[in-house]
Curated annotation (Swiss-Prot):
Keyword Repeat attributed: no
Any one Gene Ontology molecular-function term assigned to this protein's record: tyrosine-based site-specific recombinase activity
Main location class: cytoplasm
Gene symbol of the encoding locus: ynbA
Compartments it resides in: Cytoplasm
Domain of life: Bacteria
Keywords, sorted A to Z: Cytoplasm, DNA recombination, DNA-binding
Family statement drawn from the similarity comment of this UniProt entry: Belongs to the 'phage' integrase family. XerD-like subfamily.
Biological process terms in GO annotation: DNA transposition
Annotated catalytic residues: K154, R204, Y236
Role according to the record: Putative tyrosine recombinase. Not involved in the cutting and rejoining of the recombining DNA molecules on dif(SL) site.
Gene3D superfamilies associated with the record: 1.10.150.130, Intergrase catalytic core
Name under which the protein is recorded: Tyrosine recombinase XerD-like
Tyr recombinase domain residues: 90-238
Length: 238
C-alpha cells in the first residue's frame, strides 16, 4: 500500500496559523518524499524514524507528531485501510538533566509609574519580545489603543501583537515615543541600563518563558517573535 498524498486536504481541514501550517507542510512533504518509492508499512515507518534520528529530540518529536496526526487523518478518511502510528521518541534522563528551564520573573518594578525612557524600553521588550532593531523600526502610529494591538513589520511580513491593559495604561499618554524609536542602538542600550541591570536579552527571554507558561505552542511563539524557524526556541520545550 502506498502513502496517499492528501497533504493539502489535511491542512485545509485544520485551523492552523499560517506559520504552523507552513511547518506541518514541510514535515509532511518530507514524509511523502521518503515514501515515494516505498510501501506504507510499520517497518518503513521505523526506517523513517531512523532517518530523522540525527535531528534534535524536540525536532524528532515534532516530526513524529506531525506524521502520526496525518496518518490518523488518512485512516479516519478511509484513505488507508490500516491505522499506522510511529512510536514517539522517549526523552532520556540525560536529556532531562540538560533541559533548559530558567526561572520566570514578574518584574513588578517595571510596572510602576513611567519615569524614564529605559523603563519604556524594558516594557516593550517584556510585553512584546522585541529586540532593539525592532524597536528602532517602530512608529507610534503602530500602536492601536482603541483595539489594543501593536502592528510590527519585519522582512515584509506583518505581525499583530495584543496590547495588555497593564501596558496601555502606563504608556499610551506618551507624546514623544517616535523620538526614542529614532535613536541609535547604543542610546537604547544605555537608557535600558540606567533603568535596570537586566539586559535586553534577559528580558526578552522572560517574554518567551511567559508565553511558554501560557501554553503557546512553539510555532505560535515563533510567529509572535517574527522568527522563520523554531530552532532557537526548541530548548524551552524540552
Amino acid at each position: 500500500m502506498k502513502l496517499p498524498n492528501e497533504i493539502d486536504e489535511y491542512l485545509a481541514s485544520r485551523n492552523f496559523s499560517e506559520n504552523t501550517r507552513s511547518n506541518y507542510h514541510y514535515d509532511l512533504v518530507s514524509l511523502q518524499a521518503f515514501f515515494e518509492d516505498k510501501s506504507l508499512t510499520t517497518e518503513n515507518l521505523e526506517l523513517y524514524k531512523i532517518q530523522i534520528s540525527n535531528l534534535s529530540p524536540a525536532a524528532q518529536r515534532r516530526k513524529i507528531s506531525s506524521a502520526n496526526q496525518y496518518l490518523l487523518f488518512l485512516y479516519q478518511r478511509q484513505k488507508v485501510d490500516q491505522y499506522f502510528k510511529i512510536k514517539q521518541v522517549v526523552q532520556k534522563k540525560s536529556q532531562t538533566a540538560q533541559s533548559y528551564h530558567p526561572m520566570i520573573k514578574e518584574f513588578p518594578e517595571f510596572y510602576g509609574p513611567l519615569t524614564c525612557p529605559g523603563q519604556f524600553l524594558a516594557l516593550l521588550i517584556l510585553e512584546f519580545g522585541l529586540n532593539f532593531a525592532e524597536i528602532q523600526k517602530l512608529k507610534w502610529e503602530n500602536f492601536n489603543w482603541n483595539f489594543k494591538y501593536l502592528t510590527i513589520e519585519k522582512a515584509g511580513i506583518k505581525r499583530v501583537l495584543p496590547i495588555r491593559e497593564k501596558f496601555a495604561i502606563r504608556v499610551k499618554a506618551i507624546n514623544n515615543a517616535d523620538e526614542l524609536f529614532a535613536k541609535s542602538r547604543q542610546f537604547l542600550y544605555t537608557e535600558l541600563k540606567k533603568f535596570t541591570n537586566y539586559s535586553s536579552k534577559e528580558i526578552r527571554e522572560q517574554y518567551i518563558l511567559h508565553q511558554v507558561k501560557a501554553g503557546k505552542s512553539i510555532y505560535e511563539l515563533a510567529t509572535l517573535l517574527g522568527l522563520t524557524t523554531i530552532t532557537t526556541l526548541e530548548k524551552y520545550y524540552r
